[in-house]
Amino acid sequence: TGKKKLLDVMEKNAEHIYKHFITEKNEGAPGHPEVELALMKMYRTTGNKKWLQLAEHFINERGEDPHFYEKEAAKRDWTVWGNDPTAHDYQQSGKPVRAQSDATGHAVRAVYLYTGMAQLSAKSGDNALYDACKRLWESITRRRMYVTGGIGSTVLGEAFSVDYDLPPDTAYAETCASIGLMFFANAMLKNELIGEYADVMETAFYNTVLGGMQLDGKRFFYVNPLEVVPGISGVSPTHRHDLPVRPKWYACACCPPNVARLITSFGCYAYGENSDMSFCHMYADGEIKFENGMELVCKTNYPYDMTVNYSVIKGGRLAIRILERYIHTCA
């Protein structure tokens, strides 16, 4: 919109954070990774390298001192609800990020962190960081992801379990976790144009993210089991988290607004571009205008109809290809 009122508020707060951690050199990284993503967005919007520096600092700090959160808890007479400072896997703080290989802990926290890492590696060219992202990507998609693109199989900590522990009836597979997986996949596409990243992004979108919301947008799943057992799901202590029908709302209502922001920014995931090429990652009916000047019209009823037609309205002065993938990821 070009309006800066909200951005000015964000930068004012970011200046305070920058002063505390960079200027005054205080130790620490955020407990729930997400400010890194906001800082990267602010950097892309403003070009201010301070926000890139701060995001990089938080990513580099995580896991350097695995006991940091324990020290912080000892300074206070209270702790955030449900936050065990000794649970290093839960908060991805057991190792420095470049040494991590297995996706562990709270699934949403994990993929938000990995998204920030992938965004930073794409911007900085940090090969060691991207190598870590690739290892973590393989850990998720080869061994710790449901066929629906759901991740985080255990209710205990809303977390990743061990390899291949993917029970269908007690699955957690939080909607926000699959949204975060889409964030991660999209960030990986900024590093390398590999079809697998788009495949997983599409799988998560059609099978878990959209499934997490009723068609009329009035009811939502927080948890997305692959199997519901009548009389047990939502009732038994072992299955109480797996509800058989979508509730209207939640006390912890992170998923509905997360779905809303993803859908309203869908074009950023369906399409991409660089200096001389435009990309189609997913298929959606509509008009597309790229920053490089190219304009397309896509006509499709995908995924109900496998036909996808593109019309080039404006080619611009650049040599542009559209990269398409085989359609096979929608259930």
Language-model region placement:
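Glycan-recognition and catalytic cores of secretory/periplasmic carbohydrate-active enzymes
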Residues: 1-331
